[in-house]
């Protein structure tokens, strides 16, 4: 073994600025509902989160969802309180409704949401979903990104994830989200290296 320090070990030093670079396509969007390239698609989970994530055993784990219950094709979800979007606004059930509606018309996520007949916010943190047909696997499908409502036309709408998109004169960087609900982010900066394709 060499004596060189990997970025994983360097990232554990408190207060140390640690950066890595990842490829992305500048001609494509970082909006999770408009993304078309594989490069940018793989960046989405760094910036956005779903109600659930899929663990190593391919099971749904709560992420932005606090708890849920269902009876037949009717589901109710309690959204985690105190989760902030990158612009400081709090996540609510209305943002989740908006995001599911965006997903239903998105190339990437339409298949996951095609069984959803209706989706409504019945309180600030309560989401109700009615399915066309009962499906116990619904949490596995609700991994689609949640964005702030009414931001669907933006190139990178506010998310709740570990990184915030910073675009300065065409140079795009992902910076650690200092108010991320999951705690401290070890890698403070991800520089996006543009791939120019013909």
Named regions from a protein language model:
Residues 27-35, 59-61, 86, 137-140, ...:
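Short, solvent-exposed loop/turn elements at domain surfaces
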């Amino acid at each position: 073994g060499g004596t060189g320090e990997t970025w994983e070990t360097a990232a554990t030093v408190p207060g140390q600025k640690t950066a890595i670079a990842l490829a992305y396509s500048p001609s494509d969007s970082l909006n999770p509902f408009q993304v078309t390239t594989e490069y940018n698609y793989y960046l989405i989970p760094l910036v956005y989160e779903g109600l659930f994530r899929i663990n190593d055993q391919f099971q749904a784990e709560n992420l932005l969802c606090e708890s849920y219950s269902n009876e037949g094709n009717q589901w109710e979800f309690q959204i985690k309180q105190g989760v902030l979007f990158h612009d400081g606004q709090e996540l609510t059930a209305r943002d989740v409704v908006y995001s599911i509606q965006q997903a239903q018309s998105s190339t990437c996520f339409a298949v996951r949401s095609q069984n959803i007949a209706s989706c409504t916010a019945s309180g600030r943190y309560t989401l109700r979903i009615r399915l066309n047909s009962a499906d116990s696997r619904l949490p596995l499908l609700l991994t689609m990104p949640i964005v702030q409502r009414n931001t669907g036309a933006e190139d990178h709408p506010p998310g709740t994830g570990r990184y915030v998109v910073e675009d300065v004169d065409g140079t795009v960087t992902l910076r650690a989200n200092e108010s991320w609900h999951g705690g401290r982010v070890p890698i403070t900066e991800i520089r996006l290296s543009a791939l120019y394709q013909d």
